[in-house]
A protein has these predicted regions:
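Acetyl-CoA-dependent GNAT
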Residues: 6-10, 16-80, 95, 99, ...
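Core beta-strand residues in small-molecule sensory/regulatory alpha/beta domains
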Residues: 51, 131-132
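Conserved acetyl-CoA-binding loop-helix of GNAT-fold acetyltransferases
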Residues: 82-96, 117-122
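Conserved GNAT acetyl-CoA-binding A-motif
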Residues: 99-108
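Conserved beta-strand-loop-alpha-helix junction that forms the acyl-donor binding cleft
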Residues: 107-117, 134-140
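Conserved active-site tyrosine of GNAT-family acetyltransferases
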Residues: 120, 125, 147
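Terminal substrate-recognition subdomain of acyl/acetyltransferases
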Residues: 140-156
């Protein structure tokens, strides 16, 4: 069973380590400890630890805005292939649509992260477009796909 809880300052060592491992494959860009602390303190940002059986297995960061949009800014799961990411996103979708009255839940995902793209599609996310070569990585650039799910699509 997967649960989400608010990230605490003492979780940052885990968060930074998990993030570094994910950055090697260009799935996320490393944030500084200060940037994570700012996100933890920001009332419009949900910085959560993903847990299973009392163990930290990942983290996610989502951002609220005044137009009732909710952006999944990043999700990092340390233990891949066990369904933890899918369960965490389902919990976040439930929170967004049922507790804080989100209209649109959106994210962007690197085009080479085909596993994540399939997961989002299976959860009902629709492609909105491609931002071509918009993220610098090593000596080149990677493209990202913007995806979203609307409240009416979630409720079906």
């Amino acid at each position: 069973m997967v649960t989400l809880r608010n990230t605490k300052e003492e979780d940052l060592e885990y968060v930074l380590g998990a993030e570094y491992k994910a950055s090697v494959d260009a799935y996320v860009i490393n944030w500084s400890e200060e940037k994570h602390l700012g996100a933890i303190e920001d009332k419009l940002v949900d910085h959560k630890i993903i847990e299973s059986e009392g163990r930290s297995i990942g983290y996610l960061i989502a951002n609220r805005n005044p137009d009732d949009n909710y952006e999944l800014m990043r999700i990092v799961v340390s233990e891949k292939g066990k369904g933890y990411g899918k369960e965490a996103i389902k919990l976040l979708l439930k929170f967004a649509f049922e507790e804080i009255s989100t209209h649109r839940f959106w994210l962007d995902v690197r085009m080479h992260n085909t596993y994540a793209i399939r997961l989002y599609e299976n959860l009902g996310f629709k492609e909105e477009g491609i931002l071509r070569e918009c993220v610098k990585y090593k000596d080149g650039y990677v493209s990202v796909k913007v995806m979203s799910i609307l409240r009416r699509e979630y409720e079906i």
